[in-house]
Amino acid sequence: MSKQLIPGPVEGPLADNERLKRESDHLRGTIAQDLTDPLTGGFNGDNFQLIRFHGMYQQDDRDIRPERTAQKLEPLHNVMLRARLPGGIITPAQWQVIDKFAEDHSLYGSIRLTTRQTFQFHGVLKRDIKMMHQTLNSTGIDSIATAGDVNRNVLCTSNPVESELHQEAYEWAKKISEHLLPKTRAYVEIWLDGEKLGGDEEPILGSNYLPRKFKTTVVIPPHNDVDIHANDLNFVAISDHGKLVGFNVLVGGGLAMTHGDTSTYPRKASDFGFVPLSHVLEVAAAVVSTQRDWGNRVNRKNAKTKYTLERVGVEAFKAEVESRAGIQFGPVRPYEFTSRGDRFGWVEGIDGKHHLTLFIENGRLLDFPGKPLKTGMLEIAKVHQGDFRLTANQNLIIAGVPAGEKARIEALARQYGLLDDGVSEQRKQSMACVALPTCPLAMAEAERMLPAFVTDIEGLLAKHELANDAIIFRVTGCPNGCGRAMLAEVGLVGKAPGRYNLHLGGNLEGTRIPRLHLENITEPQILAELDALIGRWAKDRNAGECFGDFVIRAGIIAPVIDSARDFYAA
């Protein structure tokens, strides 16, 4: 018997986060008072959650937590800040400011590029938080709504080659970001000492904001570097003779799930149809407001847009969006994705400018022994005349380099280890979330285990004479999915220290969800299984067949067709 589809909200007692938001005075809470509380390095009560709407998460160093407990000290509370950077574009002048702050005022001294196409500071103590926001504001950056139950940092394809089309798409990413921002002045009042003026009405987000986090992208086919199926709302650029004419709209993607709860699952976004440029902002607001009103505020595990679509039906949700936006979606315009990895090295744009994409393993910019990456980026920022573009794959593009400056930029990149011809294709196609020691949700290592684990995979590929091939490999330390493992050919999801669930069967284009193959296994067990599977792939693959396609064709794993119904099928 099929489940009845009922448009509208979920009835029942609301989750406590709804009380928290309702009583927060439009996200102010008592954050300002907490900043001067000398008894704790953390935030009290509701403020622990409310700071997320201001772009921060309270964390601690889990490596030293037992030691501090033994000394009868509280955890070393600090915050991680995620900047709002629509489309990932940052100037060299801004970079120099964030470099200095990371060096002088963070516990780890690093800049972390993330899968949300922005940067994060890790390990900022409470005494430096207000100064951090003021420092960022002085250079035109904020962290409004990069976390919490709001629309978060808007991603855009990092593709400066088609410079005119990319510029148009980037401008739309900025417009969408601004249109969907919270209107409350809480951020300005608390962090920038702004005057309290009132006028906190939230016409799009509502007084209780959204039921859960909401993620938006703008993507230029054929390059799916933003992984649209990981996001709630996606605008796929449709061009005519190189000129942007509108977008196909896809709604309801998302990768997070909960171990042991089969009501949670990753889901691909659904095609709603085409909209011209004149209706983009209305459609964005209509999708957000429909999710605002119909999303599940009773059970946060089922609160994201993907679950709303499954509960009410795609057609009902789409019709409601059309009604609210005052439009009708046109037929889906043809488009195709052929890749999603970054194009490393130099490329020349149609404007004659040059762009150098750097591989930054796990997005971590730090001065490592023999590879002073952070210093290298600072030295480049001092002389670069264009801008920097952060990618959703945690890499960085030095964009807009004049021909006469190529040699100097490349020399600096090589001098500091930012450009290394010895990096394998496999390493370039691998990434992980931060996980331990800073993420409080991590169940297993991710960023810290990935480099050595990739070396082991490189060894397996070489053993089977596939050293020039690569598998899209991703690790996420918990099932929330920041590392986007649920769109990888081989995805590891942390289950416990040293143990992971092994998923297989994604594809190169990022349009297929991998299925659970083995559960709760150790790294040596994973490598043994991959050894056998890569051996079969080497022996039996069709010409050019990627690993994810092979394991499905060979019957090793069944494809996920409709994840709401078959993700957990045997």
From Swiss-Prot:
It catalyses: hydrogen sulfide + 3 NADP(+) + 3 H2O = sulfite + 3 NADPH + 4 H(+). Pfam families: NIR_SIR, NIR_SIR_ferr. GO terms for molecular function: 4 iron, 4 sulfur cluster binding; heme binding; metal ion binding; NADP binding; sulfite reductase (ferredoxin) activity; sulfite reductase (NADPH) activity. Pathway: Sulfur metabolism; hydrogen sulfide biosynthesis; hydrogen sulfide from sulfite (NADPH route): step 1/1. Disulfide bonds: none annotated. [4Fe-4S] cluster binds at residues 433, 439, 478, 482. Siroheme binds at residue 482. Binds 1 siroheme per subunit. Binds 1 [4Fe-4S] cluster per subunit. This is Sulfite reductase [NADPH] hemoprotein beta-component. The gene is cysI.
